[in-house]
Amino acid sequence: MGRSFYHFLMTYRDPKLTDQKTEFANNAYRDHSFPKQTRNYHILCDYLEFNAPYLPGMSIFDELWEAYLLDEEKNKH
């Protein structure tokens, strides 16, 4: 079984970078309610839409979700 989206997202954390993906990762790290164990797209979308004012747009999440799926597929074998 692969890692959760949250664990994938944490690979983008960096205290010095300020791009949108890094900011999302840093803010999710500080968000104690973030669904850390889920791998479900819909659960994550619902959470982010209603509880993540730090995310300026869902396109950032969508890009990272696609990267997450590719990474999971690559690491499956």
From Swiss-Prot:
Name of the featured protein: UPF0346 protein lin1971
InterPro entries noted in UniProt: UPF0346, YozE_SAM-like, YozE_SAM-like_sf
Lineage: Bacteria, Bacillati, Bacillota, Bacilli, Bacillales
Cited SUPFAM superfamilies: YozE-like
Alphabetized HAMAP family for the sequence: UPF0346 (MF_01538)
Family classification: Belongs to the UPF0346 family.
Residues annotated as signal peptide: none
One Pfam family here: YozE_SAM_like
Transmembrane segments: none
Domain of life: Bacteria
